[in-house]
Structure formats: C-alpha cells, structure tokens
Amino acid sequence: MPALSLIALLSLVSTAFARQWEVHPPQQQGRHWAQICSGNPFNRIRGCDRYGCGNYGASRQGKGEKHKGVDVICTDGSIVYAPFSGQLSGPIRFFHNGNAIDDGVQISGSGYCVKLVCIHPIRYHGQIQKGQQLGRMLPMQKVFPGIVSHIHVENCDQSDPTHLLRPIPDISPPFPQQDAHWAVVCAGNPTNEIRGCDKYGCGYFGAPRRNGKGEKHKGVDVICADGATVYAPFSGELSGPVKFFHNGNAIDDGVQIRGSGFCVKLLCIHPIRYNGRISKGQVLGRMLPMQRVFPGIISHIHVENCDRSDPTSNLERGKGESEMEV
C-alpha cells in the first residue's frame, strides 16, 4: 500500500478514536507495564521505516497530525500479553476497512486505560490479568510490506505511554547465559526464535531453496529486527569479513567465531570487529537493514555451522519459559 494511503487511513483513525473517548481514570505515574509481545522483553518501540516512525508524537504527514500512541515491535503471529490487569472491551477497529490487521481490544483497570491495535485478542470481554495471554499479533506484513511489524499502543486519554513501557537500550544480553546452549544471539529474541516461512522461503535447517538446483538451506535464520544488537553465541576467536552475496548489497557482511568446541558464521550483521577474542554474550555487532534488500521478509541473522551441520539444538533456549513479565 502506498505511504499516502496509509497516511489517509491514520488520519481517519485519529478522528474515529476521538469520538470514542469516554471519561477514563488518569494514567498512573511511576509504574511499569508487563511485557506486551513475546520476543520483545523490553517493549522496544519501532523506529522509523518508509511508512513513518513509531514514537509518541511522531509526525503524520498530510494534515500536520501527530502520532497519538507508540508502536511496540512485535513479529507477525507472536503471542501478545496483557500489560496490566483489567476489563476487556471491543473489538477496536483501527482502519474500518476489514483488512488483515483491522482488529484490537481495550483494557481498562489498575488505574490505566489502553487500546492495543493490530492484534487478534482471545476474547473481547471479561477480566484479564497482567501478563496473561491476550491474543496474537496480526499479519502486518500482508498489509504494509517492509514495515517494522508492531502493536499500536494508545492510551485512552491519548497521553504518552512511553514511560510505562520502559524501553531499555540494548546494552547487555537480556537473559543469563546457560552453558548447555548458546547465548541469546539477537536483542529482542530471547529464545533465538527461528524464522518461519515468508514469500522468500523458510528459515529452518534443510528448507528447500528455490534456485532450481534442488539445494537445501545449510543454516538457520534467527529472527532479528533491523538494527538490533547482536551478541556472541559462545566465546571464541573472530575472523572475517564473511561475505554471503558477494555483490556489495546492504546486508553483505558477517563474521566467523571459532572456539568453545564450536565454529559458526553469522551473516547479515556488521560486527564491531573482524578479529580478536570475544566472550559469550558480549556485543558482537548490529543487524543490517534486511528490509532494504528483501522488503517484507522476516529479518534475520543467517547462522551457519562451519561444517554445515544443523545448529538448531544449540540455539534452543526453552521457548515459553521466560516470555511473561520481566
């Protein structure tokens, strides 16, 4: 969808939302909400992409309007949790055109009132507890290819919810390391979740590659938002650069780590250096802008063992075990 069409829809949304406001309790200060989306333990807010920016008050082109909520990064299909305990009401329609993400719900309670949009809740009415599963993220890439998929989070009084979401800079691995498995590879993906399937293919080891040669995927694709911090999965010696495409595109970079009984190549990242020692969990670099090269793909780090064996078991970090409130 062209950016101008999105802008027009957002303008309609703001008008429609304004008509729905009732008297709500003031938003409390000094408290924090729970994790909203699995895979985003710090409620990281969307930056800027070709459709706009996700921060509160960001400019909305066309009518001089401002963004009245914040966009919390959430991969399509991810589990969504209740940020606080309260009463559900809905459905909440954002676009009023029946598209694939035109759904949402309101939660009112605990001194707060918020609308979470572009999700499909498990129900629209009744009580819900803080941290309880609320629903699933809808397929935003189907509607806006290449956007940073996100939940639109808007206080009912249109005040700024940013301080309640407590975004924290990615300065350290989000979870303690365990010797049995590799560390967290990408900030915002604490379980090293592997890319599923999109229009470009699938991310699991051995997935077919559509190149006409019957080849299989020789690594796994660990989900990682463009620009996210990347960590060393284990301690070892760096070497590189490692080029994947050999065409100089925006993601043609990477590095190899050898040590601790492992050898792996991490591609589509820009490392802080190509040589020297690195420790498990230490900052390794940044995810490169994959959306710029493959619009609409699930952005990811290509992780490939040097001997081309399957690294999946090393990456597993107990899905579902630490994805509630942090």
Swiss-Prot record:
The keyword Metal-binding applies. Residues 1-18 form the signal peptide. GO terms for biological process: granulocyte differentiation; response to antibiotic. It is found in: Cytoplasmic granule. The keyword Zinc applies. Substrate for arginine-specific ADP-ribosyltransferase. Disulfide bonds join C37-C74, C48-C53, C113-C156. Residues 307-326 are annotated as: Disordered. This is Myeloid protein 1. It comes from Gallus gallus. The gene is MIM1.
